[in-house]
Amino acid sequence: MLTSEISESEKPREKLQNYGIEALSSSELVALIIETGTKNESVLTIANRIIMKFKHVAEMQYASIEEFQLVNGIGVAKASKIMAAIELGRRISIVTNQEEIVIRCPDDAVKLVMPELAFLFQEHFHCIFLNTKNQVIYRQTIFVGGLNASIVHPREVFRLALRKSSAAIMCFHNHPSGDPTPSSEDLLVTKRLVEAGNIIGITLLDHIIIGKNKYISLKEKGYF
């Protein structure tokens, strides 16, 4: 069934115009992005297949162009459109979330990073950079892969902190298992970051481990 054969009330574009963007399902949003179906399938059928490929819609932001192309009906053009839309949304989210946000407690910081880190399949080491008022001035993923002291080097973290004229930093990484209990390597990395920060004069306010909808603050738990 082609898009032209879908009833007016079911077409994503018409639904958006009549009821607003919030009324659209995730599949309908994807359908608007990829625009067309194939000879044998409607755009909504293909869009729904994309959504079903991922356990959580947030996982789409980490998919490669090749992964999208594994979906029947998706070629390089459609895959590129999806990735461009996701990247634009990510950039808008980062800028919006950083504007005049003050970190007063671990919860404030976790609200910024939980949507990005909670559902990843690999460990990501992420940093928030703060000014003297504890306002977020920048944030970035520094390392991807298993967290250990040989990979997460304080030099890389504090080089960026100095470049951004940071007064303090907060570090985060996710545990793909969903269990945020710190490992011995997590504690060793934290110890090295604290020591380096003390020498440079940039405080490590916290190192937070993100699990599935839960977290552990190493500072609150007294690990440093």
UniProtKB/Swiss-Prot annotation:
Example of a GO biological process term: proteolysis
MPN domain mapped to chain residues: 102-224
Source organism (scientific name): Listeria welshimeri serovar 6b (strain ATCC 35897 / DSM 20650 / CCUG 15529 / CIP 8149 / NCTC 11857 / SLCC 5334 / V8)
Coiled-coil segments on the chain, per record: none
CDD domains documented for this protein: MPN_DUF2466
Family, per entry: Belongs to the UPF0758 family.
Protein name: UPF0758 protein lwe1562
Pfam families: RadC (PF04002), UPF0758_N (PF20582)
Alphabetical UniProt keywords: Hydrolase, Metal-binding, Metalloprotease, Protease, Zinc
InterPro entries referenced in this protein's UniProt entry, alphabetically: MPN, RadC_JAB, RuvA_2-like, UPF0758, UPF0758_CS, UPF0758_N
GO molecular function: metal ion binding; metallopeptidase activity
Motif (JAMM motif): 173-186
Annotated positions binding Zn(2+): H173, H175, D186
Keyword Hydrolase: yes
